Design a protein with these regions (language model features):
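Hydrophobic residues in alpha-helical segments
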Residues: 55-56, 81, 139, 172
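Mixed-charge interfacial surface used for oligomerization/domain docking
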Residues: 2-3, 13-27, 31-32, 38, ...
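A short glycine/small-residue-enriched secondary-structure motif
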Residues: 47-54, 83, 105-110
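Short beta-strand segments
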Residues: 9-10, 90-94, 120
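N-terminal glycine-rich phosphate/adenylate-binding segment common to multiple enzyme folds
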Residues: 72-104, 108
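N-terminal glycine-rich anion-binding loop in soluble enzyme alpha/beta folds
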Residues: 7-72
């Protein structure tokens, strides 16, 4: 971590390839994915390929996600502190889609001796990932935590993430949209 001015943390909602996160030193906190009573850690105990396979074969138990706990974030922040990191830029899934940012913010407040700035990406998927990648590059350039946070927020406001789904069924089942909207 000595070649960076701050560390970057994000969540698995960023859909960052593990190799890219590792190359840039980005720490990824996994969301939980539930299929019925089974719980998996996104990208850790359930790969993207296995997730999509289960979507097609496990129609009776549609998946839903849950945010990481503040404790999950505290573990990551603590491991960074033990590695000598004093500043963290933590960029997360839109607060309108998940409580992930809230968990990260609660954990950040508990970390004495560290300056942790949490940022609401206001996005999902690779939109978050692009912000995290940009932040990691700013850290490598030696930019300050405050400069990077401001630049990430300005960049966020210029991004527009668009996605399409084959069916609205899963969004409706998990309460992301109303049943009437799915008809």
């Amino acid at each position: 971590m000595v070649d960076r001015t701050f560390a970057v943390v994000t969540d698995s909602g960023a859909d960052l390839p593990a190799s890219l996160a590792e190359e840039l030193g980005i720490r990824v906190v996994p969301l939980s994915i539930h299929f019925g009573d089974e719980v998996f850690k996104d990208g850790v105990t359930l790969t993207a390929e296995a997730f999509y396979q289960r979507l097609t074969t496990d129609k009776e138990r549609p998946p839903h996600t849950s945010q990481p706990s503040p404790g999950d974030f505290q573990q990551v922040y603590e491991s960074l502190r033990e590695a000598g990191v004093k500043q963290v830029l933590s960029i997360h899934l839109s607060s309108k889609l998940s409580g992930t940012l809230q968990s990260a913010t609660i954990a950040a407040r508990e970390m004495e001796g560290m300056e942790i700035v949490t940022v609401d990406s206001r996005m999902a998927s690779m939109g978050i990932g692009m912000l995290a990648v940009h932040a990691a590059r700013l850290a490598r350039e030696g930019r300050s935590l405050q400069e990077a946070a401001a630049e990430v927020e300005a960049l966020r406001d210029q991004f527009h993430v668009v996605f399409a789904v084959d069916t609205l069924e899963y969004l409706a089942r998990n309460g992301r949209i109303g049943r009437a909207q799915s008809c």
